[in-house]
């Protein structure tokens, strides 16, 4: 909810999803309290079943969640010129885990995007990239 509200406060329309009803309720309350609820839609969604339906997005932010099965859908959902900001647990500097990105995984998985910045280490991986084309 924090990133969604931050983006909404800058005039963007946002859709936030989380598997937790508590997290979604907290995000709605934060958006209401900060006066941006009109720019926000929050839904309880289990991403294990895939991305929810919706139009192309100018920005996708995915924090602390990694499911390789969603990579193609994320790329397809981005509009031309759209930005992807993704962070995940990583095996680089940490041990293996079901939801941990392998070394170089984010770079490889999103190779068709234009990479702006990214890093991995200390158990974290992140990537900022844009989809080729213009909005």
Name each region found by the language model:
Residues 27-28:
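Conserved SAM-binding loop
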Residues 13-18:
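Conserved SAM-binding motif I beta-strand of class I
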Residues 35-48:
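Conserved SAM-binding strand-loop segment of SAM-dependent methyltransferases
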Residues 48-59:
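A short acidic, Gly/Pro-enriched loop at the edge of an enzyme's catalytic core
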Residues 65-78:
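A short, conserved alpha-helix within the catalytic core of class I
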Residues 20-22:
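Conserved SAM/SAH-binding beta-strand->alpha-helix loop
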Residues 81-94:
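Conserved beta-strand signature within the Rossmann-like core of class I S-adenosyl-L-methionine
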Residues 1-12:
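Conserved SAM-binding loop of SAM-dependent methyltransferases across substrates and taxa
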């Amino acid at each position: 909810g924090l990133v969604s509200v931050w983006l909404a406060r800058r005039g963007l329309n946002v859709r936030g999803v989380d598997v937790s009803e508590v997290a979604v309720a907290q995000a709605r309350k934060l958006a209401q309290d900060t006066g941006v609820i009109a720019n926000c839609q929050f839904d309880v969604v289990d991403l294990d079943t895939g991305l929810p339906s919706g139009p192309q997005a100018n920005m996708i932010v995915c924090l602390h969640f990694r499911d390789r099965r969603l990579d193609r859908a994320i790329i397809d959902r981005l509009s031309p010129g759209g930005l992807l900001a993704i962070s995940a647990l990583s095996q680089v500097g940490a041990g293996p885990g079901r939801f941990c990105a392998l070394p170089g995984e984010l770079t490889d998985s999103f190779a068709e995007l234009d990479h702006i910045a990214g890093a991995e280490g200390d158990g974290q991986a992140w990537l900022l990239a844009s989809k080729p084309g213009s909005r």
